């Protein structure tokens, strides 16, 4: 029986299995491939009955290196959050990009905090809508920073976040959010929204079948 899964670390508390089960009413198994060893993960992906897997930190950039076919979205982001096995090859895709384009909307300026796989997708999304983003890493927040839209992809709180001023802040981290109570933001989009959007956009790439969107939106 074909199966699907999520690769990354740490992922024991991931909500992805719940979303996938809701999307397809539990018709396919969805396993957690939790490991710090990417080669071991890919070996399982190639040799077991996986049709496709979601990919999260710290493997989004590494995923491109094992792929035979790289979608335009993944190429533009320099990272993939979906790997699909098809005709003996591995395809890399990125559903974060379109999800971010939707969430960012019509922005006058974009600040991206964090340069990992999610940060790279945010940079590409900003450029897609015609805005050259500013990138700051976790140790570059000492001075007050202002932007129309901020995308924070940090896994944990970093000193200086409290000084951000923006119309809209989009946070990737849904497990332990660190931006939801910042005083200088007018609108906050939580990581669960990001998670659900990229899932809805990516599941059909993984399975070949449309997900139950209403069920995904109501799952968490």
Language model feature labels by segment:
Residues 8, 94-99, 104-129:
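Glycine-rich adenosine-cofactor-binding loop
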Residues 2-102:
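Phosphate/diphosphate ligand-binding glycine-rich loop within oxidoreductases
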Residues 102, 187-220:
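Active-site capping/gating segments
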Residues 52, 109, 149-151, 168:
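Structural motif
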Residues 113, 127-144:
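NAD(P)-binding Rossmann-fold cofactor-contacting core
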Residues 76, 82, 163-195:
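ADP-ribose/adenylate-binding Rossmann-like module
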Residues 55-62, 118, 154-158, 174-177:
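Short glycine-rich anion-binding loops that position phosphate/pyrophosphate groups of nucleotides
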Residues 143-163, 170, 174:
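Rossmann-like NAD(P)-binding element
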